[in-house]
């Protein structure tokens, strides 16, 4: 099992979580192919992090699976923009921390469903 972490990426966590949920549990090769054609910034960022996780564990992309893909909120960068009558309003620029965990296909059993089955005695 190998991991990759990208911190402080200038990306909205709510928008990135939509894409992260789609690729969780997918084959790595299929996930990277689908992320390259996703028409937003989160697709490009997640594609690079998944590729990095595969390279970190020196795994084969054809047989590896994405065990978990998590996007956490990072610090919010605040900027001000001038407005009428001498006022200024705040602009929020959110950042994210992207965490991807990749494993060989047979290790996918270590998910929540496997733990639940063990608790039930199956």
Curated annotation (Swiss-Prot):
GO terms for cellular component: cytosolic large ribosomal subunit
Q: State the gene name recorded for this protein.
A: rplV
Q: Carries keyword Ribonucleoprotein?
A: yes
The family annotation for this protein states: Belongs to the universal ribosomal protein uL22 family.
Write down the Pfam families for this protein, in alphabetical order.
Ribosomal_L22
The protein's assembly and partners: Part of the 50S ribosomal subunit.
Name this polypeptide is given: Large ribosomal subunit protein uL22
What function does this protein fulfil? This protein binds specifically to 23S rRNA; its binding is stimulated by other ribosomal proteins, e.g. L4, L17, and L20. It is important during the early stages of 50S assembly. It makes multiple contacts with different domains of the 23S rRNA in the assembled 50S subunit and ribosome.
Which is an annotated GO molecular function term of this record?
rRNA binding
Task: Using the UniProt annotation, give all residue ranges assigned to the region (Disordered).
Answer: 103-122
Provide this UniProt record's keywords sorted from A to Z: Ribonucleoprotein, Ribosomal protein, RNA-binding, rRNA-binding
Matching entries from SUPFAM superfamilies are given as: Ribosomal protein L22
One example of a Gene Ontology biological process annotation: translation
What PANTHER family does the record tag this protein with?
Answer: CHLOROPLAST 50S RIBOSOMAL PROTEIN L22-RELATED (PTHR13501), LARGE RIBOSOMAL SUBUNIT PROTEIN UL22M (PTHR13501:SF8)
């Amino acid at each position: 099992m190998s991991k990759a972490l990208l911190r402080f990426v200038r990306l909205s966590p709510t928008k990135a979580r939509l894409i992260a949920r789609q690729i969780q549990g997918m084959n790595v090769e299929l996930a990277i192919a689908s992320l390259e054609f996703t028409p937003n910034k989160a697709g490009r960022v997640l594609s690079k992090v998944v590729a990095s996780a595969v390279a970190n564990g020196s795994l084969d992309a054809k047989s590896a699976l994405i065990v978990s893909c998590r996007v956490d909120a990072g610090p919010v960068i605040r900027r001000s923009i001038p407005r009428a009558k001498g006022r200024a309003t705040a602009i929020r620029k959110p950042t994210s921390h992207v965490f991807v965990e990749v494993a060989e296909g047979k290790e996918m059993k270590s998910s929540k469903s496997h733990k639940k089955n063990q608790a039930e005695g199956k």
